[in-house]
Protein backbone atom coordinates (compact mmCIF):
# COMPACT_ATOMS: atom_id res chain seq x y z
CA UNK A 1 0.00 0.00 0.00
CA UNK A 2 1.46 3.36 -0.98
CA UNK A 3 1.87 6.29 1.37
CA UNK A 4 2.44 9.99 0.83
CA UNK A 5 4.64 12.66 2.35
CA UNK A 6 3.34 16.16 1.83
CA UNK A 7 3.99 19.77 2.73
CA UNK A 8 1.35 22.41 3.24
CA UNK A 9 2.00 26.13 2.98
CA UNK A 10 0.10 27.98 5.69
CA UNK A 11 -1.35 31.49 5.61
CA UNK A 12 1.62 32.76 7.66
CA UNK A 13 3.97 31.26 5.01
CA UNK A 14 5.14 28.48 7.32
CA UNK A 15 5.42 24.92 6.03
CA UNK A 16 3.84 21.87 7.64
CA UNK A 17 5.19 18.41 6.76
CA UNK A 18 3.18 15.24 7.28
CA UNK A 19 2.46 11.78 5.90
CA UNK A 20 -0.69 9.82 5.12
CA UNK A 21 -2.07 6.76 3.36
CA UNK A 22 -5.04 8.75 1.98
CA UNK A 23 -3.94 12.15 0.70
CA UNK A 24 -7.36 13.51 -0.32
CA UNK A 25 -8.92 12.63 3.03
CA UNK A 26 -5.99 14.06 5.00
CA UNK A 27 -6.06 17.35 3.08
CA UNK A 28 -9.81 17.64 3.70
CA UNK A 29 -9.20 17.07 7.42
CA UNK A 30 -6.56 19.82 7.52
CA UNK A 31 -8.80 22.25 5.65
CA UNK A 32 -11.72 21.48 7.99
CA UNK A 33 -9.53 22.33 11.00
CA UNK A 34 -9.43 18.70 12.13
CA UNK A 35 -5.90 17.88 10.99
CA UNK A 36 -2.73 18.49 12.93
CA UNK A 37 -2.91 21.01 15.76
CA UNK A 38 -0.19 23.06 14.01
CA UNK A 39 -2.35 23.78 10.96
CA UNK A 40 -5.50 24.77 12.88
CA UNK A 41 -6.06 28.49 12.54
CA UNK A 42 -3.29 28.84 9.96
CA UNK A 43 -5.51 28.53 6.89
CA UNK A 44 -6.00 28.85 4.08
CA UNK A 45 -3.66 25.96 3.43
CA UNK A 46 -2.21 25.15 0.03
CA UNK A 47 -0.57 21.93 -1.05
CA UNK A 48 3.09 22.73 -1.69
CA UNK A 49 4.68 19.27 -2.14
CA UNK A 50 3.71 15.60 -2.47
CA UNK A 51 5.88 12.51 -2.75
CA UNK A 52 4.43 9.02 -3.12
CA UNK A 53 6.33 6.20 -1.44
CA UNK A 54 5.89 2.45 -1.45
CA UNK A 55 4.86 1.99 2.19
CA UNK A 56 4.28 3.62 5.57
CA UNK A 57 7.78 2.91 6.86
CA UNK A 58 9.36 4.66 3.87
CA UNK A 59 6.98 7.60 4.27
CA UNK A 60 7.81 8.00 7.95
CA UNK A 61 11.55 7.98 7.20
CA UNK A 62 11.12 10.50 4.39
CA UNK A 63 8.91 12.74 6.55
CA UNK A 64 11.60 12.76 9.24
CA UNK A 65 14.32 13.54 6.67
CA UNK A 66 12.33 16.45 5.25
CA UNK A 67 11.64 17.83 8.72
CA UNK A 68 15.40 17.91 9.36
CA UNK A 69 16.05 20.06 6.28
CA UNK A 70 16.55 23.80 6.57
CA UNK A 71 13.67 25.92 5.28
CA UNK A 72 15.63 26.87 2.15
CA UNK A 73 15.87 23.22 1.09
CA UNK A 74 12.18 22.63 1.82
CA UNK A 75 11.34 25.59 -0.41
CA UNK A 76 13.51 24.12 -3.19
CA UNK A 77 11.61 20.82 -2.93
CA UNK A 78 8.30 22.69 -3.13
CA UNK A 79 9.44 24.77 -6.09
CA UNK A 80 10.66 21.71 -7.98
CA UNK A 81 7.42 19.81 -7.30
CA UNK A 82 5.28 22.74 -8.41
CA UNK A 83 7.25 23.14 -11.65
CA UNK A 84 6.79 19.43 -12.44
CA UNK A 85 3.07 19.59 -11.73
CA UNK A 86 2.33 22.74 -13.71
CA UNK A 87 4.08 21.38 -16.81
CA UNK A 88 1.73 18.36 -17.03
Model-derived features with residue positions:
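GIY-YIG nuclease catalytic motif and its immediate N-terminal context
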Residues: 1-74, 78-88
